[in-house]
From Swiss-Prot:
Residues 213-282 form a coiled coil. Residues 1-127, 147-217, 272-420 are annotated as: Disordered. Residues 272-281, 294-304, 376-392 have a biased composition (Basic and acidic residues). This is Male-specific lethal 1 homolog. The keyword Transmembrane helix does not apply. It is found in: Nucleus; Nucleus, Nucleoplasm; Nucleus speckle. Residues 158-169, 185-194 have a biased composition (Low complexity). The modification Phosphothreonine is found at residue 396. GO terms for biological process: chromatin remodeling; positive regulation of DNA-templated transcription. SMART domains: PEHE (SM01300). It holds the Pfam family MSL1_dimer.
């Protein structure tokens, strides 16, 4: 700051004064006067790195005090060079500086370094140049020059300055590189400290100056930076805390999932062990059942051989019936579970041979069976004694077990055909899974028979081709209801007021009732929907699966089996009932005679066709 202010003040000196006044300005600038001078505020900063022009010859006067001519012939645009007053002859101190604009002095003023003679107007010299290169002077040399008076501008016969008298014949030395101004070693400590402080404050200040405004703005910037850093730290801390919470939650979920997986693995292992045990038990049960079946077939073969030689009509009860029923009674529970495993096709011809020996109408009660309980026989007797028509299907099992006796020399096909013809329902020899639902025998019928009156029901006797007996066909009769004629209508009663007001009054109450019912229905429907939504939410939160409805069937369960029937003929069952066997017949109605049918046919034949008309 000291060097720049010296340059500015030296440049701002009035151009119209004498050289002594100019020296006073230069001394004041070298001593570092106050900065609030009027010339300092108007000065501008010099660029640090500006290439200097070659200096002209030193400003020196001859012994006689004549002014030295400029090298360019005192051109109008030449530049002069001011050298320090205390410099040694033939030497140029290292300094930095630049060009400073100077006001153009009038032609009558005196030049620096020239004896007190004014410049002649007609000597060919132009007025003072517009720009002048100024090199800053060292502080110590300026102080010494200020103390000792130099004969800058004396009388005509005075001695000139040593810098002006001594000139380098080889030419001017090279200029130094631009940079910060070096301080003289002879400078005082106060001057050094002041210059360094000003230089540092000027270099560090953000606004390019060492004033108080720069320090305040710098402090405000630092405060804002600190606040921003604190906000950033708080935000990062919050993010870290949130991430830590998420990590803890994920760890807890992972632990719970691992625990569930372990439980599921344990359950799967237990289920596998249980399945293996059940399979082992089932395989053992199948083996024992197959052994029992083979033993049963062998016993049946041995028992059937002596029966074929007998010719009596009555079947001896003990050999086959007791053995079959006894074994069947003991094996009731496993036979129901392994119904598909029984070799029915192998035993069918043997059973047919045995059945040909039994009489046609022998009931079950005549068989002396020691293994069967008495309760089963009583139930079957009660079911046979019931006079109800649909109970005839209960009577069919004894007929199946006791077919007509025939000679043993008949082939198997003839025996099968005869047995199939005797059955009152459709049957097949192809084995398939079917369920014949028969209600259990009970003392009281499930459906009470309606009282039948001969007066209201007409009976038609039709020959039955199945059993050779007459069957009764119930046909409903027509009833005559006597209707009394109406009395004579009264014209006053028939008239009815159908005005809008009367109609609205009559129907207003009904409409209100209907609206109330509708509102009530809508409210109930809304409540049901809300309840369903709440249940769904609860099931989703708790993970409870909705209970699926149990699939039930109208067929009885296999645990309710009371008796077994082995036969090669399976009934054709539909909806749990066997289909009746119907012989092909023409459809006839009993109340229509031949004459009425002929009339209908004639009328149909006489009707002309509309398509034949043209």
């Amino acid at each position: 700051m000291t060097m720049r202010s010296a340059v500015f003040k030296a440049a701002a000196a009035p151009a119209g004064g004498n050289p002594e006044q100019r020296l006073d300005y230069e001394r004041a600038a070298a001593l570092g006067g106050p900065e609030d001078e009027p010339g300092a505020a108007e000065a501008h900063f010099l660029p640090r790195h500006r290439k200097l022009k070659e200096p002209g010859p030193p400003l020196a006067s001859s012994q006689g005090g004549s002014p030295a001519p400029s090298p360019a012939g005192c051109g109008g645009k030449g530049r002069g060079l001011l050298l320090p007053a205390g410099a040694a002859p033939g030497q140029q101190e290292e300094s930095w500086g630049g060009s400073v604009p100077l006001p153009c002095p009038p032609p009558a003023t005196k030049q620096a370094g020239i004896g007190g003679e004014p410049a002649a107007a007609g000597a060919g010299c132009s007025p003072r140049p517009k720009y002048q290169a100024v090199l800053p002077i060292q502080t110590g040399s300026l102080v010494a020059a200020a103390k000792e008076p130099t004969p800058w501008a004396g009388d005509k016969g005075g001695a000139a300055s040593p810098a002006a008298t001594a000139s380098d014949p080889a030419g001017p030395p090279p200029l130094p590189l631009p940079g910060p101004p070096p301080l003289a070693p002879t400078a005082t400590a106060g001057t050094l400290a002041a210059s360094e402080g000003r230089w540092k404050s000027m270099r560090k200040s953000p606004l390019g100056g060492g004033g108080g405004s720069g320090a305040s703005s710098q402090a405000a910037c630092l405060k804002q930076i600190l606040l921003l850093q604190l906000d950033l730290i708080e935000q990062q801390q919050q993010q870290l805390q949130a991430k830590e919470k998420e990590i803890e939650e994920l760890k807890s979920e992972r632990d719970t999932l691992l625990a569930r997986i372990e439980r599921m693995e344990r359950r799967m292992q237990l289920v596998k062990k249980d399945n293996e045990k059940e399979r082992h038990k089932l395989f053992q049960g199948y083996e024992t059942e197959e052994r029992e079946e083979t033993e049963l077939s062998e016993k049946i073969k041995l028992e059937c051989q002596p029966e074929l030689s007998e010719t009596s009509q009555t079947l001896p009860p003990k050999p086959f019936s007791c053995g079959r029923s006894g074994k069947g009674h003991k094996r009731k529970s496993p036979f129901g579970s392994t119904e598909r495993k029984t070799p029915v096709k192998k035993l069918a011809p043997e059973f047919s041979k045995v059945k040909t020996k039994t009489p046609k109408h022998s009931p079950i009660k005549e068989e002396p069976c020691g293994s069967l309980s008495e309760t089963v026989c009583k139930r079957e007797l009660r079911s046979q004694e019931t006079p109800e028509k649909p109970r005839s299907s209960v009577d069919t099992p004894p007929r199946l077990s006791t077919p007509q006796k025939g000679p043993s020399t008949h082939p198997k096909e003839k025996a099968f055909s005869s047995e199939i013809e005797d059955l009152p329902y459709l049957s097949t020899t192809e084995m398939y899974l079917c369920r014949w639902h028969q209600p259990p025998p009970s003392p009281l019928p499930l459906r009470e028979s309606s009282p039948k009156k001969e007066e209201t029901v007409a009976r038609c006797l039709m020959p039955s081709s199945v059993a050779g007996e007459t069957s009764v066909l119930a046909v409903p009769s027509w009833r005559d209801h006597s209707v009394e004629p109406l009395r004579d209508p009264n014209p006053s009663d028939l008239l009815e007021n159908l005005d809008d007001s009367v109609f609205s009054k009559r129907h207003a109450k009904l409409e209100l009732d209907e609206k109330r019912r509708k509102r009530w229905d809508i409210q109930r429907i809304r409540e049901q929907r809300i309840l369903q939504r709440l249940q769904l939410r609860m099931y989703k939160k708790k993970g409870i699966q909705e209970s699926e409805p149990e699939v039930t069937s109208f067929f009885p369960e296999p645990d309710d089996v009371e008796s077994l029937m082995i036969t090669p003929f399976l009934p054709v069952v539909a909806f749990g009932r066997p289909l009746p066997k119907l012989t092909p017949q023409n459809f006839e109605l009993p109340w229509l005679d031949e004459r009425s049918r002929c009339r209908l046919e004639i009328q149909k034949k006489q009707t002309p066709h509309r398509t034949c008309r043209k």
